[in-house]
């Protein structure tokens, strides 16, 4: 990939299988982006849009998200609705995540939450 002038190719962690093979994936990816919407949906069997985003703030899904951080050897960020929710962002910060993509309407509040985070 570098031969083609692309030095930073990342991988979206959105499926249980991608979590399972994370070590191998990182042999090629320079960074990871955790897609919480699809990942949560596939772990629970629920439709992406069928429930309140705060259902993702729970110990069981937290264990999956912690596993990703523990296995990561490259920078990891979170995208998806969980990072653009006040309780969701606090949850992710407590788990150890430090890089997020958030919606434009939530950006200012996200900055405030991160600045106020004590951890």
Predicted regions and their residues:
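Conserved alpha/beta-domain cores
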Residues: 1-119
